Regions:
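Extreme N-terminal segment that seeds HTH/winged-HTH DNA-binding domains in transcriptional regulators
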Residues: 1-46
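Short, structured interface segments
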Residues: 69-75
Length: 135
């Protein structure tokens, strides 16, 4: 797949699709570092802003992590905790507050699951590490 500047699809979306495909195929394995912004820009002959936007999109999807000065890498598959919902409980998915994101070390774009127990107790869990089970 190549970036087509004449396409109706924005360049950053094309690059995000290309990188996503390489991640999903295993060409960029979990934990591996992606090429730098400059390398991607030069390799695909596109502007650095398009690269930044593509990386931001993949980060919001939870596929990659970025760290200033350290680079960008593919997220490892996370172990999921199985939580059994008790009768009378409810669960919703929502975006975390900045405090929750910091406390749970959540990447941008990762939701939380808020569970309300039958007695009104509230638990907030990372959405990418939680699997809900109905009894």
């Amino acid at each position: 797949m190549r970036i087509d500047p004449r396409s109706h699809t924005p360049i950053y979306i094309q690059l995000a699709d290309l990188l996503r495909e390489k991640i999903e195929s295993g060409e960029f394995a979990p934990g591996s570092t992606l090429p730098s912004e400059l390398q991607l820009s030069q390799e695909h002959q596109i502007g650095r802003e398009s690269v930044r936007m593509a990386v931001a999109l993949l980060r919001s999807e939870g596929l990659i992590r970025t760290s200033r000065g350290r680079g960008t890498w593919v997220r490892e598959a996370l172990q999921r905790e199985h939580i059994e919902l008790t009768p009378g409980s409810s669960a919703i998915a929502r975006m975390p507050s900045s405090r929750e994101r910091r406390e749970m070390d959540l990447d941008e774009g990762v939701p939380v699951i808020e569970i309300r127990g039958p007695k009104g107790e509230v638990y907030v869990l990372p959405g990418d590490q939680t699997e809900l089970i109905r009894p």
